[in-house]
Amino acid sequence: MKKNAKMKAPTATKTAAKTPVVDYRVSKEAMENPEVFAKLAKWGREEIKIAETEMPGLMALRKEYKKQQPLKGARIAGCLHMTIQTAVLIETLVELGAEIRWSSCNIFSTQDHAAAAIAAAGIPVFAWKGLTEQEFNWCIEQTIVGWGKEGFNMILDDGGDLTNMMHEPRFAKEMKKIIGISEETTTGVHNLEVLVKQGKLKVPAININDSVTKSKFDNLYGCRESLADGIKRATDVMVAGKICVVAGYGDVGKGSAHSLRGLGARVLVTEIDPICALQAAMEGFEVTTMEDAAPLGDIFVTATGCCDIITDKHFMKMKNNAIVCNIGHFDIEIDMAWLNKNSKMREVKPQVDIHTLKNGKQVIILAKGRLVNLGCATGHPSFVMSNSFTNQVLAQMELFNNRDKYQDIAVYRLPKHLDEKVAALHLDKLGVKLTKLSSKQAKYLHMSPQGPFKPEHYRY
């Protein structure tokens, strides 16, 4: 659709998958009231303009590639948090020639004004804050159906929900048209690797998460700012002086632990990996088990990507009014199923619930055990998301235009020179002056003055 196309009322048609097809679906209030829709869309557009000034990587790609239209013919189904920053990503893909249908990858992460702004621009989007599980799946289905006879040919995913749905037998016909997948996050990459091991992955995929300019920036620096933002918006708690427990010391856990320590907390870390545990200890954190930490913590943060990190035995040991939240992708890290069955819950405000246990103690759960930084705040800052999303655009271009390089069905990473390009596109915004290698220096190091400057195995 053209960016300034007039909005149509949602209409339903029959499809092979027997799923109604509509042009867009955003918050109920916006769908029912044109004035609310217009107000939300205007607000969203103003914030998108501000975000663009903080997302130099995406804006540089628009400038560099707009005339070439490298994504002309790419029809992309996207499933990624529908935020203001994602709106800039979507419109960058459109600027480079792509057609888009979009849904969110989390039931609470959508910013309704961002979704309205994208819908008002004529781009099909299916997302609103506070989806039910049924609505969540319906929204993803809308990115699969509704393309017409041509169908779509690219997947841009975050967490693997769209990828997994596309691998269901009911969408086998649609899957045959897919060229490739780009996956944003740790959980989704793990899902792809499982599909490969099982021999079930149908198309090549690019792992965005392990690009250095994603994992070492989004996961680390992004969480370092957005975790505390979510906790403080939700609870107004004073972090200084508190005992905080961070489960997991990968990049997300590192950012979370340093964030809380920076606010004056005493931070305990739990880990399964001896290397990460040693890192945490060498950086001054006490490393212990959740069993030992449960009665000590005032604030608990899970950041593992695994299930059953905080379970019934931990809840029963916690202090009264302990705050529990998650910054991993899914709500399986905290055993919400057990908690919901074995406590009385009352909502304090949206995304903040008090659960009273059978022992009389209360536990404060944020974002219902889902992503606290997006459920209780607005997620990572625009600048760091520009790193991640620039990788996404380059990955879509790679898969779409260089298909010969990705004939084998596997999970790939972006080439090192593109990772370095992403970083380079963000330097001017920070006033960075980069030193240039002389020809003599380059010869001594056996590399091109233009890079790549590090081998693939370098860990940064």
Swiss-Prot record:
Binding site for NAD(+): 185-187, 219, 248-253, 271, 327-329, 373
Coiled coil segments of this chain: none
Co-factor binding comment: Binds 1 NAD(+) per subunit.
GO molecular function annotations of the record: adenosylhomocysteinase activity
Catalytic reactions of this protein: S-adenosyl-L-homocysteine + H2O = L-homocysteine + adenosine
EC number(s) on file: 3.13.2.1
Keyword line: Cytoplasm, Hydrolase, NAD, One-carbon metabolism
GO terms under biological process: L-homocysteine biosynthetic process; one-carbon metabolic process; S-adenosylmethionine cycle
Cellular localisation: Cytoplasm
Enzyme class, first EC level, given as a word: hydrolase
Annotated positions binding substrate: T83, D158, E184, K214, D218
Pfam families in alphabetical order: AdoHcyase, AdoHcyase_NAD
Required co-factors: NAD(+)
GO cellular component, as recorded: cytosol
Family annotation (Gene3D superfamilies): Adenosylhomocysteinase-like, NAD(P)-binding Rossmann-like Domain
Pathway: Amino-acid biosynthesis; L-homocysteine biosynthesis; L-homocysteine from S-adenosyl-L-homocysteine: step 1/1
Main location: cytoplasm
Paired cysteines (S-S): none
Matches recorded under HAMAP family: AdoHcyase (MF_00563)
Family: Belongs to the adenosylhomocysteinase family.
Function as written in the Swiss-Prot or TrEMBL entry: May play a key role in the regulation of the intracellular concentration of adenosylhomocysteine.
Entry protein name: Adenosylhomocysteinase
Species in which this protein is naturally found: Bdellovibrio bacteriovorus (strain ATCC 15356 / DSM 50701 / NCIMB 9529 / HD100)
